[in-house]
Amino acid sequence: TLKDTKHELIVAIANYGYNTQVMRAAEEGGATGGTVLHGKGVGMKRAEQFLGVSLVSEKEVILIVAKSSQKNAIMRAIMDKAGVDSKAGTIVFSLPVTSTAGLRILEDSQDEEVNDENNN
């Protein structure tokens, strides 16, 4: 089931220029790396009118695949060091990863887990 996945995709969306701050925080929480994508928010005018503040439309999306057991620590570290109340303005959410291909470090850990299960 999705609840029993071994890995999670952590998605952090930060204001442009703050990906290093977000990644440092994530690494302090246990992340081993990530991928940064540059993006632009849409529908910002309406959000600005609703919130009454100026919003930065240029964003950076930081993608981190981590073990499910590390997810909460990584997300908490990001929010503590670069969260929505900071200049980074980061929001974070996660999605279950049901399978991977080409992520060698994750595949190695999966192989080790299978070997451990077979030896017990």
Residue spans for each PLM region:
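Positively charged, small/polar-rich N-terminal and surface patches that mediate targeting and assembly
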Residues: 1-120
